[in-house]
Design a protein with these regions (language model features):
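Non-catalytic accessory segments flanking enzyme active sites
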Residues: 57-135
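Mobile cap/lid helix-loop segments that gate and shape the active-site cleft of serine hydrolases
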Residues: 219, 223-227, 241-242, 279-320, ...
Length: 389
């Protein structure tokens, strides 16, 4: 037998370790099996249940949904909309009676290829201010059709207006939101991209120190619940105040305003358009689903929840409040937090409401070959068509 030198043994050992590491890297980690206080003592517990989501789904099945859509005529549907819109306003915590002066201010104006971008602030309610970017296309006829653009979870509004994590300009439309406010401007529509409360620069000081993508939704949305309100209601009010701001700008046509958003921004878009009829059309990306299959079954941010809503309505009922105004929905077939089957189900139920109102041609869905991300291939032309009509 040939005796190996110490150096050769070292090389052999290193090679074996590298090969083993490569094999481990190539193999997916084995799922860890839960071991807890009930492991090994399951006998006799067959009729016991410890799963809280299963319990929630039992409650879902028993919930009355007192204002679920049942209308058969246009007049019945319109009466139903009035009832549910009033109840939904109550459920999200209501809105201020007084419209505080906006006190708008332009902080910065910059010119880019094809559009001008203004950084603006205005007041929403006492103690609450909103940051937004206004994107004005060079070639748009004025006053211009305008889109209120609401980002989903992540870095906030910068992620939809071409600003990277270092505050520098970018042109590659990176990230899951693909700078969709810029895409709106490139499609010839003005865009007012707002920073949602608890996102980006509108986070609390403690959370902001933890990094750009650290969510502040937990303390803020939790605080809203403690006073009988909701983060959804707060963000919808910001959209309503954005509509007020648009009405102050001569370049913008306040009678041709749409709203669009993805994920958490899709939540805000759906509820805002349902509750404020000044919004003429909506584009909801990566959100329309059922409460049962999304926020009722999967882990989601607390800002998605409206206490008691399932006693009155499902998500498709909320979507039905948008009718007869145009609504476009897009869903990724591999979206893992808003499952596609339930998205299609919810859209089908929404279309039934549009059908009773005689406007089934004003609601569309695109299922695209992707995950939880903005697509926009048909949605943006849909908005342009309806807002420029």
């Amino acid at each position: 037998m040939t005796k190996l030198s110490r150096r050769e043994l070292g090389r052999l050992a290193a090679g074996l370790m590298a090969a083993r590491a490569a094999r481990l890297e190539a193999q997916p980690p084995a799922p860890s099996e839960y071991v807890g206080p009930l492991t090994g003592v399951e006998k006799g517990l067959e009729d016991r249940r410890f799963d809280p989501v299963a319990y929630t789904l039992d409650l879902y099945a028993a919930a009355p949904r007192r204002l679920g859509f049942q209308a058969r005529t246009r007049s019945e549907a319109e009466a139903w909309q009035q009832q549910l819109r009033s109840k939904l306003t109550e459920l999200v915590g209501g809105f201020p009676v007084e419209h505080l002066p906006l006190r708008p201010m332009t902080l910065e104006t910059r010119t880019f290829r094809g559009y001008r971008r203004e950084k603006i602030v205005f007041d929403s309610r006492p103690g609450v201010s909103v940051l937004a970017y206004l994107l004005l296309p060079e070639q748009a006829r004025t006053p211009s059709a305008t889109l209120i653009c609401v980002p989903g979870h992540g870095r906030g509004v910068d992620d939809i207006v071409g600003i990277d994590e270092h505050g520098a300009d970018r042109t590659d439309k990176a990230g899951y939101q693909h700078d969709f406010a810029i895409q709106a401007a490139e499609a010839g529509m003005a865009a007012v991209a707002i920073e949602p409360m608890a996102f980006g620069c509108r986070r609390d000081a403690i959370t902001a120190r933890k990094g750009l993508s650290t969510s502040a939704c937990q303390p803020a949305a939790g605080g809203a619940l403690l006073v009988g309100q909701t983060m959804i209601g707060w963000r919808v009010w910001d959209v309503m105040r954005t509509l007020d701001y648009i009405a102050t700008r001569a370049e913008l046509d306040s009678s041709r305003v749409g709203c669009m958003g993805i994920s958490g921004g899709g939540t805000v878009t759906l509820f805002s358009t349902a509750l404020d009829t000044r919004i003429r059309a909506a584009f909801v990306s990566g959100y329309l689903n059922t409460f049962r299959d999304s926020v009722g079954s999967l882990s989601h941010c607390i800002d998605n929840y409206v206490p008691g809503i399932l006693n009155w309505a499902e998500m498709y009922d909320v979507a039905g409040l948008i009718a007869p105004r145009p609504l476009f929905v897009e869903s990724g077939e591999r979206d893992d937090i808003f499952p596609i089957r339930a998205s299609i189900e919810s859209f089908t139920r929404t279309r039934e409401i549009y059908s009773v109102l005689g406007v089934q041609d004003r609601v569309e869905q695109e299922v695209f070959p992707g995950e939880h991300s903005f697509w926009g291939k048909r949605g943006l032309p849909f908005l342009a068509r309806h807002l420029n009509a």
